[in-house]
UniProtKB/Swiss-Prot annotation:
Gene3D superfamilies tied to this protein: P-loop containing nucleotide triphosphate hydrolases
Tree of life domain: Bacteria
Keyword Acetylation tagged: no
UniProt keyword Repeat present: no
Enzyme class: transferase
Pfam (any one): Cytidylate_kin
Name recorded for this polypeptide: Cytidylate kinase
Chief location bin: cytoplasm
Subcellular location: Cytoplasm
Organism: Nitrobacter hamburgensis (strain DSM 10229 / NCIMB 13809 / X14)
This enzyme's EC code(s): 2.7.4.25
Binding site for ATP: G7, P8, A9, A10, S11, G12, K13, G14, T15
GO molecular function, a single term: ATP binding
Gene expressing this chain: cmk
Length: 209
């Protein structure tokens, strides 16, 4: 079984994906981490994030063992990741990796922005997570401060709105819900409530409802 979870930045899809995978004993892939890893590689090399050729080279040399690096969660890396993820050749370079991950039995949960529309259009269950931008900014600010980073909620909100605009309007794999996706509004749900709502969606699909 393949469960695709999509949604904008800081909507809670990553936490939901991880918890849902644990519930069903499936593998989990936060596909945003892949693009963040490419972004970090470019930043570490002092390369121009706008250079698509360099971004493709970084994508082809990714080391999955480094996907847990704490630096991948910084706002700077996130901003560059949003830029490189818009490059068609970068997305193509990472497509095979993601599809092979999804195909591994007994099942997988992948979260990102184009899982249900591009990466796994035949996914058994598709969930599109949404949340109010102000709520998302507050969550992202608290996450940053919990890591000891300085964060201004107004600045974070502006960045989120900018990323939403870029993600929704990019020509390749724009952020949008698949036609058969189940929309889950996460604005007023805590982690447990969000998980229960997602499980209800999965079970309804499995039961053919």
């Amino acid at each position: 079984m393949i469960i695709a979870i999509d949604g904008p930045a800081a909507s809670g899809k990553g936490t939901l994906g991880k918890r849902l995978a644990h519930h069903y004993h499936f593998r989990h892939l936060d596909t945003g981490v892949i693009y963040r890893a490419v972004a970090k590689a470019l930043l570490d090399a002092g390369a121009d994030p706008a250079d698509e050729a360099l971004a493709v080279a970084a994508a082809l040399e990714l080391d999955p063992e480094k996907f847990g690096h704490p630096a991948l969660k910084t706002q700077t890396v996130g901003e560059v990741a949003s830029v490189v993820s818009a490059f068609p050749r970068v997305r193509e370079a990472l497509l095979t990796f993601q599809r092979q991950f999804a195909a591994e039995p007994p099942g997988a949960v992948l979260d990102g922005r184009d899982i249900g529309t591009v990466i796994c259009p035949e996914a058994d269950v598709k969930i599109f997570v949404v949340a109010d931008p102000v709520v998302r900014a507050r969550r992202r600010t608290l996450e940053a401060r919990s890591r000891g980073e300085e964060a201004d909620e107004a600045v974070v909100l502006a960045d989120i709105l900018k990323r939403d605009e870029r993600d929704r309007n990019r020509p390749i794999a724009p952020l949008k819900a698949a036609a058969d996706a189940h929309v889950l509004d996460n604005s007023n749900l805590d982690i447990e409530a969000g998980l229960k709502a997602a499980i209800a969606i999965v079970e309804a699909v499995r039961a053919g409802r």
